[in-house]
Amino acid sequence: MQVLHVCSEMFPLLKTGGLADVIGALPAVQIEDGVDARVLLPAFPDIRRGITDAQVVTRRDTFAGPITLLFGHYNGVGIYLIDAPHLYDRPGSPYHDTNLFAYTDNVIRFALLGWVGCEMACGLDPFWRPDVVHAHDWHAGLAPAYLAARGRPAKSVFTVHNLAYQGMFYAHHMDEIQLPWSFFNINGLEFNGQISFLKSGLYYADHITAVSPTYAREITEPQFAYGMEGLLQQRHREGRLSGVLNGVDEKIWSPETDLLLASRYTRDTLEEKAENKRQLQIAMGLKVDDKAPLFAVVSRLTSQKGLDLVLEALPGLLEQGGQLALLGAGDPVLQEGFLAAAAEHPGQVGVQIGYHEAFSHRIMGGADVILVPSRFEPCGLTQLYGLKYGTLPLVRRTGGLADTVSDSSLENLADGIASGFVFEDSNAWSLLRAIRRAFVLWSRPSLWRFVQRQAMSMDFSWHVAAKSYRELYYRLK
């Protein structure tokens, strides 16, 4: 079984979000699992530099101009690169300029990605062609459409990492992207009078996956579907929509081997975690106090992530004797709010604006509770890292958060399945009640340790997801 992942970023070469983590981990595990998985990416500068053994496969003139297809390897995974400097050789973000304006030629840049994904199934590399083209998010959403236009030379899977990003472009671009105008149709890639790369993937793929079972259900409902609920309900009825939970890359995220921690530990040596907490308190300017529960946030600061609720609930958290360490960037209003809280409560609130991968490991190793109060969360990786590190996740019941964290209720404690704290409603009162439950459990150290061990014993390795995808590929074949 030969599978080509078509996508726009890959950790650690280039990362703007969780998609990169998935592509950085899943193909390698699939190879271990017996699937010949390769990855197709645009040759953005950071990616091009990271693939040091890239060789020319072929050169082509395309609707987007001349391209060179390169092939190399990264961490044992075969990587195809679309080398088109006039489209991809730009500094900074792959999607927008330094003023945060989307590149005006994004329609061409990402149509080309989908087109090359299809052409790979038509023999662009004469020595390797995929049985399945697995496209990820809107950037690769045209790949299933091009495959449909070419008579479906391979099966296609389209994975939704976040339905909120739809890849919308004016209709007149149909003349430029080498797809028949007949595809610009309500039964096709047209959405609200525009081309939607996302809808293209949803409509033309043989199967759609979402990155958690709960999110797969949620996106059939109007409040989560952004207007796509009719199509997604139809795909659900046809058995062509399912959820496959993302995993954790245990080579990178494991407290037993994590060299970024001051003190490494396992579920049997959890007392070693205390040194990480002490170092984190020092680094964040917090009072060094092993008796104060340390709550943490590692997140983009946006309304979607529910960080406004944390600001609202913060006085209640601090009154009970808790501390907060925050690492993140985003909404200027939220940034100012957290910086003001840090100034008002020195020793209790520490804030770092920005994102540093290495420091996120130190927070995960040192905190007691990781807050993920998202309004919606397709899968979420932060809570999975928390479980892995014995840093109990406090989450809202939505998407992948609902699939991965069990509340420390009395019955769940009795059944041995408690792994964190879960609240229902997207408001500060509901969040504060969950924070209160965390304080109650914290006051019972042996129970807290029991839940930590339970959380750390859960299996969210990529091997589970790889098995699900392999079964799906063979079903399609």
Curated annotation (Swiss-Prot):
Pathway: Glycan biosynthesis; glycogen biosynthesis. The keyword Plastid does not apply. Keywords: Glycogen biosynthesis, Glycosyltransferase, Transferase. It catalyses: [(1->4)-alpha-D-glucosyl](n) + ADP-alpha-D-glucose = [(1->4)-alpha-D-glucosyl](n+1) + ADP + H(+). GO terms for biological process: glycogen biosynthetic process. It holds the Pfam family Glyco_transf_5. Transmembrane segments: none annotated. GO terms for molecular function: alpha-1,4-glucan glucosyltransferase (ADP-glucose donor) activity; alpha-1,4-glucan glucosyltransferase (UDP-glucose donor) activity. ADP-alpha-D-glucose binds at residue 15. One of its GO terms (cellular component) is cytosol. Its EC number is 2.4.1.21. Gene3D superfamilies: Glycogen Phosphorylase B (3.40.50.2000). InterPro entries: Glyco_trans_1, GS/SS, Starch_synth_cat_dom. Belongs to the glycosyltransferase 1 family. Bacterial/plant glycogen synthase subfamily. Synthesizes alpha-1,4-glucan chains using ADP-glucose. This is Glycogen synthase. It comes from Escherichia fergusonii (strain ATCC 35469 / DSM 13698 / CCUG 18766 / IAM 14443 / JCM 21226 / LMG 7866 / NBRC 102419 / NCTC 12128 / CDC 0568-73). The lineage of its organism: Bacteria, Pseudomonadati, Pseudomonadota, Gammaproteobacteria, Enterobacterales.
